[in-house]
Amino acid sequence: MRILGIDHIGIASADLGKHIEIFGEKLGLEIHGFEEKDPYGGLRTAFARVGDTDFELLEDRVPDGDQKAIDQRDIARFVARRGPGLHHIALRVADIEEAMRDARAAGLHVIDQAPRPGARGSKIAFIHPKSTGGILIHFVERPDQVQTAHATGPDGGTVEPD
């Protein structure tokens, strides 16, 4: 498994606008990558950049008091049970299928059977927090890294993908 670095840290929010204000205006971080899957409800995300890492700000919009909708939405359920805050840590990997195989071989419970679509055109897969000491971790393979993930070795020489 080749972990390239921390891709982002996920923050579950009940009010995305409030977290954008905190991370953008108050902390002075660059806000980018706003996505809204459905303007009438569903997941909204934005990213706040610090160095080479992002905070992924996530809000599930569900009708007030709709317990069924809350139970069916990961972020809404998390916020209802624990309140807003740290949700996950995402590790950038060179090859998500390899990372999933290696994690399973190491005895980690990979939730996803196959990679699923993530934000910014990425592929993602989650590891169950019960197998990681209570921390939700997910792998991220980004389309912009696929061509460059194996381009240079530690000595600067070209390295071919496996």
Task: List the model feature ranges, each with a label.
Residues 1-2, 18-21, 25-26, 30, ...:
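Intrinsic disorder/low-complexity detector
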Residues 7-10, 90, 140:
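Residues embedded in well-ordered beta-strands within globular domains across many folds
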Residues 2, 13-20, 31, 46-49, 56, 69-162:
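Vicinal oxygen chelate
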Residues 1-43, 48:
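Long, hydrophobic N-terminal alpha-helical segment
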